[in-house]
Each structure stands twice: as structure tokens, then as C-alpha cells.
UniProtKB/Swiss-Prot annotation:
Disulfide bonds: none annotated. Its EC number is 4.1.1.50. Pathway: Amine and polyamine biosynthesis; S-adenosylmethioninamine biosynthesis; S-adenosylmethioninamine from S-adenosyl-L-methionine: step 1/1. It comes from Enterobacter sp. (strain 638). PANTHER family: S-ADENOSYLMETHIONINE DECARBOXYLASE PROENZYME. It is an enzyme of class 4 (lyase). The active site is at 112 (schiff-base intermediate with substrate), 117 (proton acceptor), 140 (proton donor). This is S-adenosylmethionine decarboxylase proenzyme. Is synthesized initially as an inactive proenzyme. Formation of the active enzyme involves a self-maturation process in which the active site pyruvoyl group is generated from an internal serine residue via an autocatalytic post-translational modification. Two non-identical subunits are generated from the proenzyme in this reaction, and the pyruvate is formed at the N-terminus of the alpha chain, which is derived from the carboxyl end of the proenzyme.
Amino acid sequence: MKKLKLHGFNNLTKSLSFCIYDICYVKTAEERDGYIAYIDELYNANRLTEILSETCSIIGANILNIARQDYEPQGASVTILVSEEPVDPQLIDPTEHPGPLPEAVVAHLDKSHICVHTYPESHPEAGLCTFRADIEVSTCGVISPLNALNYLIHQLESDIVTIDYRVRGFTRDINGMKYFIDHEINSIQNFMSEDMKGLYDMMDVNVYQENIFHTKMLLKEFDLKHYMFHTQPEDLSEEERKVITDLLWKEMREIYYGRNIPAV
């Protein structure tokens, strides 16, 4: 697509949202509590702020405000308001203060923003634990959130990823012609590095006429050691390893396809 000469500001809104999952198997209630405490500390509000601040640098956005909060018993959220143009440092709020409660998040959606919420959880009986990071990067103007895609997936050590990208609104050129998208895209995968594509099985569901793009990703390589917490696979019997592997694969496929799979 040729470079457009716009009439005024680029009014398109580009939103990239995705869920990133980390899966783990634990043998005891103590291991479960230990995993949740570990993952909650690993992705606390301070670390997430560092990741999102670097994301702003990658996409060329200027930080206006940062709100962050660690929650009890677990979970964290960070919201960063950003602008495309440089801003007067005197107008920036550099202080730290609690992030929004879930019902208050909509108050941030009228600006360009980057936000993340984390959700550690566990199965009541089967020993399965999942950590989900829910991330949204929404920008107005020429800034593209797709530039941060590889960085965010790598930083959050993802087993499964579901990604949605949408362009909303329209902008006009100097002749008054409306444009509902200002760049070429037929798949989110086009914005991923080759090494990233090699790590995951991927599936697209796109609605081109609505400028809606969806990609699902499932890690190809399965190493049981990667999914155990404080237990080594070699300390388990062959039958135990098979049972745990089957449980993990079923859990991962259910998350990937977004539906429960009946036991065979």
C-alpha cells in the first residue's frame, strides 16, 4: 500500500489483544501452592511494568501515565497510557499508584493504551495449573502494535497463544477519500519472525472485509521436564509419565481449540 497523504490526524484505532498461557503439572497441594506463588512473583506488577515499558519503546510510543497493582491472593495488572507524539515532561504523571479495578478498566479505553492482567489458576483435583496473561495494545495514529508481537510472546514464555488484531474507524486523505485500514495485512503471522513460526503450530481465522484477524498458536516441542514443578520426569514410572503427558496434552488442546474434549 502506497504512503497516504492524510487530511489531519490518522484516526484509525489498531488493537492487538492476546492471551498467553503457561501450563504446569504438580503432584501435591504443596507443589500447587508453590507454583502459583512462584509464577505470581515472576510476573508481578514491577516486572510487567518493565515489559510494557519496553513494549512502548519498541512501537515508538511515549508514556503518559503508568498505573499498576499486585492483587491478593494472586494476580497483577498494569495499564500504561501512551501517545504518538512527544509530550511535555511537565504534563506526565510519573508517580506510582494502584491500577484499576476490573470494572474500572473501561475508563482507560478512550486513549491509546497498553494493559496486562494476570490470572494464575489450578484444577481442583488433576494437578494441572495454568497461568494466563491477558494483554491489550491499542493505538491511534500511525503506531502499530504489531511491532511488539515477537517481544511479548518471548518475554512471557508462552505454551499457547491466542491473538486478535482489529483496525477500527477510518481516516481521510487530502482529497477526502476514506481509508478503513492504512497497511497491508492478510495474516498476523506475517508480523512474526521465522524462528517464532518454527516454534509453533498455528491456525488463522480471519474476517478480511471487517479488518479482523485471529491467530492461534500451540508450541510444537513437548518436553515433559518443561511442564513439571519440583519433580523430575526420570523420578516417575513410565506409566506415570504417560498419564501426566496425556493430561497435559488434553489440557493444552482444549485451551488451543477453545472447547472441552471428551475423555476417550
